[in-house]
From Swiss-Prot:
This is DNA polymerase IV. SUPFAM superfamilies: DNA/RNA polymerases, Lesion bypass DNA polymerase (Y-family), little finger domain. GO terms for molecular function: damaged DNA binding; DNA-directed DNA polymerase activity; magnesium ion binding. InterPro entries: DNA/RNA_pol_sf (IPR043502), DNA_pol_Y-fam_lit_finger_sf (IPR036775), DNA_pol_Y-fam_little_finger (IPR017961), DNA_polymerase-Y (IPR050116), DNApol_IV (IPR022880), PolY_HhH_motif (IPR024728), Rev_trsase/Diguanyl_cyclase (IPR043128), UmuC (IPR001126). The record marks F23 as: Substrate discrimination. The gene is dinB. GO terms for biological process: DNA-templated DNA replication; error-prone translesion synthesis; SOS response. One of its GO terms (cellular component) is cytosol. It is found in: Cytoplasm. Residues 14-198 form the UmuC domain. Its EC number is 2.7.7.7. The active site is at E117.
Length: 367
């Protein structure tokens, strides 16, 4: 029977920090009148003829079922008393850099996953603190004292479990999963909550009657590899709390894009959006093939006079999903000022990339 060794490094101390509803929280901090109000970062559909999409929202808005990538129109229907804010992304980036400076006070092993979340390896740290839990509490305290923002923290021996833990008690939560607790923690977790298991994989796992970590634990390694290829190899280990991916402080930020130049100018909106969809499909397929996900979607439009417009939207969660990339691309285009000039070039880019957690490994890599 095909079997690979199970090597589990439980000696590390990893923290995952995730800011709570970051964009909305910054707006609420800067404008105290927003306190206790549902806040949605996205264009107000009453001002755009129903066009637009939700970038993120605060917890008050989430109570109404509002979530990232939802159309602004639907968000308004669910929560008509919400305050819509178009968003100041350069300001959010500035605040994100301030948060990163706080991380650097504790360790240089910081792997930013996006503007508002990062992994930290504090196995050895600048303050010589042996307890990772104490470091996490100090970071939460520093962020609150210096920036008046809250974050949630997950502490464990690897990135996979630390990421899951940070999402366990939001907002302002701290969840610790020790090596001896990992198996029980994962058993109870719905498979859809496993970081890196996408929507299509969840559906396939459900078809196998796998709904929780406990269900996944019952499936043999060879069966998972047979059904999912390299991803199955990784799933088998994740179910057992095994993930030895290092914190990479120098990870390279890349983007995945698709753009086309048209010899015959595009004037009709339906034609333009059909081409946007083709670009979005190519981007999604490339991201899935590269095992990358991204949080920022950018579109580029060049007109017949060679004037060029680019506009971006940052999402709550990373994606490689075609439907999401396509919908957001169309929404961004709808926000551009009308231009009667023909379109010469269209592009869609996914950036703010990170590795898809649970990325698939070639069996040759294990030789």
């Amino acid at each position: 029977m095909l079997e690979f060794p199970l090597i589990n490094d439980t000696s590390r101390k990893i923290i995952h920090i995730d800011m709570d509803a970051f964009f909305a929280q910054v707006e609420m901090r800067d404008d105290p009148s927003l306190k206790d109000k549902p806040v949605i970062i996205g264009n107000d559909p009453r001002k755009t003829g129903g066009r637009g999409v939700v970038s993120t929202c605060n917890y008050e808005a989430k109570k109404y079922g509002v979530h990232s990538a939802m159309s602004s129109k639907e968000a308004y229907e669910r929560c008509p008393n919400a305050v819509f804010i178009s968003g100041n992304y350069s300001h959010y980036r500035e605040v994100g850099m301030q948060i990163r400076e706080i991380f650097k006070c504790y360790t240089d092993l910081v792997e930013p996953m996006s503007i508002d979340e990062a992994y930290l390896d504090v196995t050895t740290n600048k303050l010589g603190i042996k307890s990772a839990v104490k470091v996490a509490k100090l970071i939460q305290y520093d962020i609150w004292q210096e920036l008046h923002l809250t974050c949630s923290a997950g502490v464990s021996y690897n990135k996979f479990i630390a990421k899951l833990a940070s999402d366990f008690q939001k907002p302002a939560g701290l969840t610790v999963v020790l090596p001896e607790e990992a198996q029980e923690f994962l058993k109870k977790l719905p498979i859809a909550k496993f970081h890196g298991v996408g929507k299509k994989s969840v559906e396939r796992l459900h078809d196998m009657d796998i709904y929780t970590g406990a269900d996944l634990l019952k499936i043999s390694e060879i069966t998972l590899i047979d059904r999912f290829g390299r991803f199955g190899f990784d799933l088998f280990r994740k179910a057992r709390g095994i993930s030895n991916s290092p914190v990479k402080p120098n990870r390279v930020r890349k983007s995945i894009g698709s753009e086309r130049t048209y010899g015959k100018l595009l004037y009709n909106e339906d034609d333009i959006k059909a081409e946007l969809t083709k670009n979005a499909k190519r981007v999604a397929e490339s991201a899935q093939k590269a095992k990358k996900v991204g949080r920022i979607i950018v579109i580029k439009v060049r007109y017949s006079d060679f004037s060029t417009l680019t506009k971006r939207m940052t999402l709550d969660k990373s994606t490689q999903d075609f439907d999401t990339i396509d919908r957001i691309s169309h929404s961004i285009f709808d926000q551009l000022e009308e231009n009667s000039s023909g379109v010469r070039l269209l592009g869609v880019t996914l950036t703010g990339l990170e590795d898809q957690e649970g990325r698939q490994l070639d069996l040759d890599d294990l030789a």
